[in-house]
Amino acid sequence: MSLSAAANKISDNDFQNIGPAPRPPSSNSQGRTCYNQTQPITKLMSQLDLTSASHLGTSTSKKKSGWVSYKDDGILSFIWQKRYLMLHDSYVALYKNDKQNDDAILKIPLTSIISVSRTQLKQYCFELVRCSDRNSVSSGSSSSLNVSSDSNSKKSIYIATKTESDLHSWLDAIFAKCPLLSGVSSPTNFTHKVHVGFDPETGSFVGMPTNWEKLLKHSRITGEDWNNNSAAVIQVLQFYQEYNGAGNPTNTLDKPQSGETSSSQKSLPNSYNDNKLRNNSVNSKSSSGVSSSMVSQRKTSQPPNTKSPVSLGSGSLPPINTKLPTSQSNIPRHLQNVPNQQYPKMRNGHSPTNGQFPRGPMHPNNSQRSLQQQQQQQQQQKQQHQQYPYHHQGPSPSPSPSPSPLNPYRPHHNMINPYSKQPQSPLSSQSTQNQAIPRYAQNSSPTAAHFQPQRTAPKPPISAPRAPYPSNQNATSNTHVQPVAPKNDQSTPQTMRQAPKRPDADVAQPGGVAKPKKPARPTMSTAEIMSKLKKVTVNADPSQCFKVIEKAGQGASGSVYLAERTHIPTESNMIELINNDIDEPHVGDKVAIKQMVLSKQPRKELIVNEILVMKDSRHKNIVNFLEAYLRTDDDLWVVMEFMEGGSLTDIIENSPTNDNSHSPLTEPQIAYIVRETCQGLKFLHDKHIIHRDIKSDNVLLDTRARVKITDFGFCARLTDKRSKRATMVGTPYWMAPEVVKQREYDEKIDVWSLGIMTIEMLEGEPPYLNEDPLKALYLIATNGTPKLKHPESLSLEIKRFLSVCLCVDVRYRASTEELLHHGFFNMACDPKDLTSLLEWKE
């Protein structure tokens, strides 16, 4: 027979792995006589142990042993049996006891074991899978493929140890001995990490969650930005998703809106009129797929004394006074029959479409035609939303009530509504169409919710970047001037802010990467809340103490009224308030009254917290809480100090010098306002309270040029046990970098916001207002200290002041105590020099 013929008869079974070869004979380790020497064997008989495993033909040395619990997938699969497990060189054996003389009840060759992995069937348990068909097992890597393909030949046994260390010890020992496992186990508890990158050829991001991809697709974040700081891009996306309602409807970014004021309310500050803004609707989603709540709404400029007469009727809440005017005589005819949910946005004469930036002015003579166009656009947006939910731009047909903040001055465009806890049921539509009813839940997509600046942005920059602040006295700045949108001299309606909007409760939240949810904080029961409210409220009928002058605004959970005090109660709570008050109340005082419906407040405990904070924070630079009345268990009246001058935002927007080449305010005026604000902040910080939402909207003035801080809905108190916070609240453009990066922070975030507010008064808007929402957050996180438009026109003192306020490193950022000693405040003007800024209200 030839060699080739013999080779054809060789089968795979002729080359089976029959185990290790027997050990060769070796000399005695103690130097004694070996067996191959010429000696009488009888002298060595005593040294022979016929039962020794070292002299057997096959290796049976024991490597590891111990007691375990065992069960298989056979007839007794429901019983865990106690067995003694032994690991030998060539097999694993299970015995009834630890005596090696007994036969094993189960012996598994190591060459038949194809898988060993931990299982949750029992604590400290692992599964051993073996192949029962010996013919299907072959050596090498190919054998595992053959065995795994034949599921019928597999059998499993489960072995449980007593401790975690025993479990890992057995796994390591079995892996090391089994030839088919190669010492590498199957993965356990693994997580699939998504690799995100940027493809320069296609210009798109790859390997990214779907909702992130849609956000970045139309944003201004470029591949260069990704390459420069990809971690910052991820932080921005996580920030946007986590705090824009992804998986949690409470974490929504409140959306500022604009509307029209009543000519009968010229004496009201726009902070009051801000509550009216909740009555008007705007498109809530930009065409980029990014939430339009950061789309700019500040007008570039506006001539003073240009108001469009609109009067608000009574709201859905019970009015305070039945004599409250509800006339429509001041409403333009073409607006009287406009349904509430089709009420257009008219700010600065612009009517943005699809949530984009305004493209051009709208002439007042064409307002009716523009209104019809907006209605058609909103109908188209609803149809588009049915096909493309991510690009929804119109309002939802059924608004849901959003809790109304306690402070009547509150402009309602903060990041997170502190009273929001869960989505509310939709409100029924009101029969009175001419009354502006707030529409809080107009965004049907969480990603379309509430991430929007408060002002109309100028045209995108076309010149070089702004120059940074000089770090020393000799620093010079030579930069190109960034153009700002031209001033609109046409007659436009007076503008204000509208209430935030919330995503609908029944809309599916977007997918993507999300952080683990933190456990919910325990909340007080209704009985506890009512008990605390009664302790801080006056037990009297407020309708007998105040005469309502006019209605300033309407919210989903309450109304705001301008009233005059007619009587001072004599209850003990009121006497205590009078004794602790800075200005004793008098009959005839003008006050602001916020009437709140408690049943429409999801988190009533925050109302109690805010009242307590305001009650303990009485200062000449803080809008003071006067008193509160719990009329019924569902009707709360909060009385606040009246600031007839309006907000700093209104003063900036209506300044006669607010144009491309001049600052809205002079440096002495800025120094005075910032100094007064800083004094109020120092008072709060000395009490370990962080305001967390300092901006021009929350700084109010009166006719005597007194400057006061308002809006304590987002304040937090620091303690020894919790000296820092990490909650993402506030308004994005005024946020410090550490807040955007989701790091812990302290009182110095208010100092950063104070510096941004100073830039507002210098340039008419905060930095990055004209940027895409995600790009703005990216720039805040990466650029740090923003750059000025015209640093060459500023004094050295104000640039030094900004440099210590806007220091990225918190360790070197000034405190409010240090700021009050800064030389910039030496140039502050007298209060009478601010009266010219209030002439636009006359």
From Swiss-Prot:
Domain spans labelled Protein kinase? 546-825
What is annotated as the active site?
Answer: 693
Q: Which Pfam families match?
A: PBD, PH, Pkinase
- Catalysed reactions, as listed in the record: L-seryl-[protein] + ATP = O-phospho-L-seryl-[protein] + ADP + H(+); L-threonyl-[protein] + ATP = O-phospho-L-threonyl-[protein] + ADP + H(+)
Class of the enzyme per the UniProt entry, highest EC level: transferase
| Residue ranges with Pro residues bias | 396-408
Decide whether keyword Chloroplast is in the record: no
- Which keywords does this Swiss-Prot/TrEMBL entry list? ATP-binding, Kinase, Nucleotide-binding, Phosphoprotein, Serine/threonine-protein kinase, Transferase
A Gene Ontology term for the protein's cellular component: cytoplasm
Q: Which InterPro entries match?
A: CRIB_dom, CRIB_dom_sf, Kinase-like_dom_sf, PAK3-like, PAK_BD, PH-like_dom_sf, PH_domain, Prot_kinase_dom
Q: What is its EC number?
A: 2.7.11.1
So which residues are the signal peptide here? Answer: none
Q: Which residues form the PH domain?
A: 61-179
Q: Where is the composition biased (Low complexity)?
A: 279-296, 308-319, 372-387, 418-435
Where is composition skewed (Polar residues) in this entry?
247-274, 297-307, 323-343, 470-481, 488-497
Domain of life (superkingdom): Eukaryota
Instruction: Tell me if Phosphoprotein is a UniProt keyword of this record.
Output: yes
* Ranges where the record places region Disordered: 12-34, 247-524
Sites of Phosphoserine modification: 29, 46, 351, 367, 425
Listed under GO biological process in this entry are:
cellular bud site selection; cellular response to starvation; intracellular signal transduction; mitotic cell cycle; negative regulation of gene expression; negative regulation of sterol import; negative regulation of transcription by RNA polymerase II; positive regulation of protein import into nucleus
* Name of the protein this chain belongs to: Serine/threonine-protein kinase CLA4
* Protein species of origin: Saccharomyces cerevisiae (strain ATCC 204508 / S288c)
Q: What is the lineage of its organism?
A: Eukaryota, Fungi, Dikarya, Ascomycota, Saccharomycotina
